[in-house]
Amino acid sequence: MSLILNRLSKLWLGKSRRSTLLLLSNGFSSCSRKKQTPPCFVVSAELCEPYEACLGKLVISEVHNDMINLEKKVHLELLYNDIFDKVVTIGASNGWVATLSGDDGILRLQDDLNPYASYTDPKSIPLPPLVTLPCCQTQIVTNVSMSSSSPEDEDCVVAVKFLGPQLSFCRPAQSKPEWTNIRIENSCFFSSRVMFSKKEGMFRILGAGGHLVGTWDLQNHKHKIQRLRFKNIPELTKTTNELMDSCCTYEHLVESVTTGETFLVKQYKKTVEIDDGVAKMRTEYLMVFKLDGEGNAVHTEDIGDLVIFLSMSEPFCLRASSFPVLFPNSVESLDYWENVTVELADYLVIRGFRPFLAPYLIPPQHID
């Protein structure tokens, strides 16, 4: 225990301000509408008494704002997986983190890291034991997606994409929830992430390379594959092409609920350092394509008032005008070693490079 506490005491980073009141979006101040919190992410958890309980007080950062010390206490194992080796935080969606227990192998959805959820009564929703399809695995998870803001909603469907062919769905609010497991045949989806399209009411997966989009309709038990055609691709300089060729490419599919638009983001990242066998990567280039219903992916440097948020959580879009600190026509990206803002019009890059324990951007939460 003393060794764990000693390691934790060295991990807390940065200066912060202390606050018990979180600022609300000016864009939702009307009394006729619910208030909305600004997008944020967890920076760390500050070790607190009683130390033997291994609890920490959350330190968060609202996007483009200072860090804030909260009074909310969380189990440190949610942030420091490598120290405690009890649970693995495998993804997040709508402010809920998904964890996989090393003791019982159960996947749980928890709101502990959501600064706007209950301080005294955190929720932990266990899902049924995972079922592994033949020639598949359920130990390594690509990401988790939810069809609504809470797994307690009656119609909420949770999708878990595993590395490899398996895609699994569950309705946690049912009296006897169970998994619906699908084996994906096309290998271009094996390492891809799943997202939920509110516009279509279906889960979608972007294939590696960004040329195919798979859609799964759970109600009619159907799926379809759409091939994308890239258009309006700009002519790039030789230097830029060489830079892109030296990078790893990450594709993201994200939908704007307010405008109904769907975007494909190609993010080019390069390893800048190897630390204890782990690659620290930096965003070198980024391209945004707007998708239409005909399968066209049109390159654009103008997404208007929108901001695209990318992290290890499910991606989302917001209107910048609803939150004064946001930059319109930009992309925000948070990873384990990088926090970067890219303004698309003039490709202005604002970058922070430091470790992030929980690189899960939390979208705005509705509060009373």
Task: Indicate residue ranges for each PLM-predicted region.
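Short, solvent-exposed coil/turn segments at beta-strand boundaries
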Residues: 34-39, 62-67, 89-96, 147-156, ...
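A non-catalytic, helix-rich entry segment at domain boundaries
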Residues: 2-94, 98-106, 115
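A structural detector for beta-sheet-dominated domains
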Residues: 44, 61, 77-79, 110, ...
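Tryptophan-centric aromatic hotspots in well-structured domains and transmembrane helices
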Residues: 39-41, 95-97, 123-127, 354, ...
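A broad structural signal for short, well-ordered beta-strand segments within beta-sheet-rich domains
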Residues: 18, 40-42, 188-191, 230, ...
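C-terminal closing repeat unit and adjoining cap/tail of repeat-based domains
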Residues: 2-7, 53-70, 75-83, 91, ...
